[in-house]
């Protein structure tokens, strides 16, 4: 679900306190959104609808300070409010994580070229929007979406950079399939979908017990 900036900041702090690298999925390939998340302390960004090398380079420009990118210098939490900018700048040159989200057939077709960029650390598939870009939203058995996902699977097999997949409806068989396909970066479920499906499952179980 969508969250505001203060909620994002709180989540970054909680995740960091558990010695895990916080990644923020921004709502758009927008320099202000990316900069705010990074200045708040995100270790990396997941950027939606990266369909081309040009889209990827736009995000890279927003993530990195010159000379790699054109990110403006802000003295926020990540830079220890100015006291730690020099240390942060050294860290940022090598440690920022950039994960493009591939959720359009154009992104699938350009995936090899996108992954060839040094600053790209991997990718994650957004299956629903990908199926929508093929005019078959949610039709997982349709030949066009099957072919597109097979093409991505081949890219995963031929690249050292990790491939990811968003499994929207948590399902053990789907999870096992994607892991077998070589995906190593899994977004498993969606908060509201997970709650709704779990409640439905439990209610069905309760109904069966009552019938006995």
Language model region names:
Residues 1-212:
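Expand to "…catalyze enediolate/carbanion chemistry for C-C bond making/breaking, isomerization
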């Amino acid at each position: 679900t969508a969250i505001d900036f203060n909620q994002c900041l709180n989540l970054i702090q909680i995740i960091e306190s558990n010695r895990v690298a916080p990644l923020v999925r921004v709502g758009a390939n927008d320099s202000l959104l990316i900069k705010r998340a990074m200045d708040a302390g995100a270790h990396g960004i997941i950027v939606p609808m990266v369909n081309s090398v040009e889209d990827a380079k736009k995000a890279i420009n927003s993530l990195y300070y010159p000379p790699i990118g054109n990110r403006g210098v802000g003295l926020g939490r990540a830079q220890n409010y100015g006291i730690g900018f020099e240390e942060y700048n050294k860290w940022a040159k090598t440690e920022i994580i950039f994960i493009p989200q591939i959720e359009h057939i154009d992104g699938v077709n350009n995936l090899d070229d996108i992954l060839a960029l040094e600053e790209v650390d991997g990718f994650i598939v957004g299956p629903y929007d990908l199926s929508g870009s093929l005019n078959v939203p949610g039709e997982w058995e349709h030949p066009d979406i099957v072919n597109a996902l097979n093409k991505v699977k081949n890219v995963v097999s031929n690249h050292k950079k990790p491939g990811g997949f968003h499994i929207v409806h948590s399902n053990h068989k789907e999870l096992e399939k994607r892991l077998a396909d070589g995906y190593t970066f899994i977004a498993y479920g969606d908060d509201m979908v997970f709650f709704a499906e779990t409640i439905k499952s439990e209610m069905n179980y309760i109904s069966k017990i009552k019938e006995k």
